[in-house]
């Protein structure tokens, strides 16, 4: 199955972007070539940019506190697996503690490190990190891969709590919904939301339907899923086939 996700608000959109960037950082940091570690470092800059646009730390703490209260209330329910519930609450409490221990905003990493600031200012220029522009960075790229990796991990350490909080919130959100089989008749599907508020929509497609691309949109009244198909380099075009898929609407 291939999964497409659509956030209903800017807060969830930001968390999804951070999740994607952290995954990219992991991948390129696990490689060995200097160019791959260059991508890891520029990805770290992107994470700092996204995380610095809003007070994510406060938002995450508030959401985790809200989830802890809701889950704690379930301890009186004998039908709930108390061991699993305690594990989830423990994870949430650990995330809150880690976030409370962090000092400053994500962008503080750049303002405190002039060398990283100089690399970032050149990295946004096409071809701006050549050896004649940043000889010190060029020399760093020729250090052993283990040293480069250790440096990037050190620079990313202030973001560990933010990543843990983001991961926990998104996991709880994704687990909050139930999937249902629907069909996009003539390539299009729409559903009234009947006043219910959602934060995330998921579309699960069978691998055999990989050629069909869902374009999703929603407002507080209705959601739409319109399937398109792309031929070569041409723009995606609408399709009129009946396409089955799994739809999941998630909300805390």
Swiss-Prot record:
Per the record, the GO terms for biological process are: division septum assembly; FtsZ-dependent cytokinesis
Q: Does the keyword Lyase apply?
A: no
> Per its database record, what is this protein's job?
Cell division factor that enhances FtsZ-ring assembly. Directly interacts with FtsZ and promotes bundling of FtsZ protofilaments, with a reduction in FtsZ GTPase activity.
Report the main location listed first in the record.
cytoplasm
The source organism is: Cupriavidus pinatubonensis (strain JMP 134 / LMG 1197)
User: A Pfam family this protein belongs to?
Assistant: ZapD
The UniProt entry, under InterPro entries, shows: ZapD (IPR009777), ZapD_C (IPR027462), ZapD_sf (IPR036268)
Q: What is the gene name?
A: zapD
Q: What is this protein called?
A: Cell division protein ZapD
Q: Which keywords describe this protein according to UniProt?
A: Cell cycle, Cell division, Cytoplasm, Septation
Asked if Cytoplasm is a keyword of the record, the answer is yes
């Amino acid at each position: 199955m291939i999964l497409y996700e659509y956030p209903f608000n800017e807060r969830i959109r930001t968390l999804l972007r951070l999740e994607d960037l952290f995954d990219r950082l992991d991948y390129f940091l696990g490689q060995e070539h200097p160019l791959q570690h260059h991508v890891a470092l520029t990805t770290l800059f992107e994470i700092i940019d996204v995380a610095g646009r809003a007070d994510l730390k406060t938002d995450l703490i508030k959401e985790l506190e809200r989830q802890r209260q809701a889950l704690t209330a379930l301890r009186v329910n004998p039908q709930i697996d108390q061991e699993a519930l305690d594990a989830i609450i423990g994870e949430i409490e650990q995330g809150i503690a880690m976030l409370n221990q962090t000092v400053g905003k994500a962008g503080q990493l750049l303002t405190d490190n002039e060398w990283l600031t100089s690399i970032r200012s050149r990295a946004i220029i096409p071809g701006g990190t050549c050896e004649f522009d940043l000889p010190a960075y060029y020399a760093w790229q020729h250090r052993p891969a283990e040293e480069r990796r250790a440096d990037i991990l050190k620079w990313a350490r202030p973001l560990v709590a933010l990543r843990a909080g983001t991961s926990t919130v998104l996991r709880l959100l994704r687990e909050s919904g139930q999937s249902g089989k629907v069909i996009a008749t003539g390539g299009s599907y729409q559903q009234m939301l009947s006043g219910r508020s959602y934060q995330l929509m998921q579309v699960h497609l069978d691998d055999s339907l990989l050629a069909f691309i869902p374009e999703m949109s929603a407002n507080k009244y209705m959601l739409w899923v319109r399937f398109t198909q792309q031929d070569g380099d041409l723009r995606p075009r609408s399709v009129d086939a009946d396409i089955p898929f799994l739809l999941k609407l998630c909300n805390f």
